[in-house]
Amino acid sequence: MKSGVYTLLIILVFGLTYGGVIVIILSYLKLFKKKLNKLAVLLPLCILGFFLILIIIFQYSWEGGYAVLYVFLVSLIGLGIHVLVFCCIFLLITCCVKEMNKWIGLTIICFVPVLYSIYGFIIPRIIKIEKVSFSHPAFNSDTPLRILQLSDVHLGAVYQKKFVETIVDKILDNDPDIVVITGDLFDDSLDVGESWLEPLKEVDVPILFTAGNHDCYYEKKDVIKVTNKSNIIYLNKDTYEFNGVRFVGIDYDEDLEKSLTELKDNGKLEDDIPNILLLHAPKNPKKLKKYNIFLALSGHTHNGQLFPGNLIGRIMFDCMNGVCKSGETYTYVNSGVGDTFFPMRTFTRSKISIISIKKKN
C-alpha cells in the first residue's frame, strides 16, 4: 500500500517537475509554436518516470540496486525542483531587466541549481549539535538533566545501519543522561530495523521512543517488538519518571487531547515534577498548558527541508523550528537528523539536540 502510494507520487512529481522545467526553458528560448508541443513534452517524461519506477520495484533490495536507484531518482527530482524554482525566479527578473542575453540566462538557470543541489545533498551529512536549556521550579536537582533528542531518523533506502552508527557516536560523545526519539524512526525499514538498530545497544542510558506518522504505517505491535529488542522503551499514552522529570509519550495517530485528559484524570500528570511531552508533530504550547505540560519535544517539520518548503511550513505550523513559548509552557521543535523523500536539505540543517533541564532559582 505504502510502496504503491510512493510509486504514484514519484511518477507524478518526476513528470510534472521536469515537464515544467522543460516547458519554461523552451518557452524562454521561444522554441514553442503551439500549446500542443508543451503537452507532448509532459507525456514522454511521465512515461520515463513510470519505467524508472518499474526498475526500482523489480530491483527492490536494501543491499542491492533499489537503494541506489531510489536515491538517484529522488535526487533528480530534487534537482528538478531546484531548477524549476530558479526558472521562476529568473523569469521574474527578466520582467524587470529588458535586455539580457538568453544564453547567459539559460546558463544561470542550469548551472546555479546544480551547485545548489550539490550543496543540498552534502549539508544533511553534516549533523549539527544544538544545545538549549530550560528551568523549572519543581526540578530539585542541582545537577542539570541532559536529554539528547533525536527526531525523524527515517531509516530506509537512504539512511541505514551506518547512519545509526554515526548517531551512536554522537550520543556517546555528548554523554546524555537519557535519549528521546520523537518519531519517524522508520521509513521503509521495519523488516530490517532490528539489525540496523543494533548499534544503539552501545548506549547505556534509557532510550525513549514515541511514534511518528511514518512509524504508524506499520502495525503497532510490530514496531513495539522491534524497538524492545533494541533496548528502546516504547512510550505511548503512558509516563516514565527519570531523575526528577516525568516523560509523557503520545503517538502521532492518537487523539492528543483525549490521551492527555485521561492521563491527567488518572493522576499521571501532576505538577509535582516537570512534565515533558514527547510528541512527533508540534503543537502550540498554549494548547498544552491545561495538562500541566512544561515542555513538549517534537519534530516532523524538517524545518521545511527544501526551499520553498521552509517558507510554506511557517504557514502550516504554529511552531516550525526551535523554541516556542506560551507563559511557562514551551514547545521545542527539532528539525530532524534524517530527511524524507529527497536526500537533500536547503536553508536548514540536520540536527541532534541536547536539552538541559535546570533548577529554577
Q: Where do the language-model regions lie?
A:
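N-terminal signal-anchor transmembrane helix
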Residues: 66-70, 96-150, 156-173, 192
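Soluble catalytic domains of enzymes that build or remodel membrane lipids, polysaccharides, and related
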Residues: 139-361
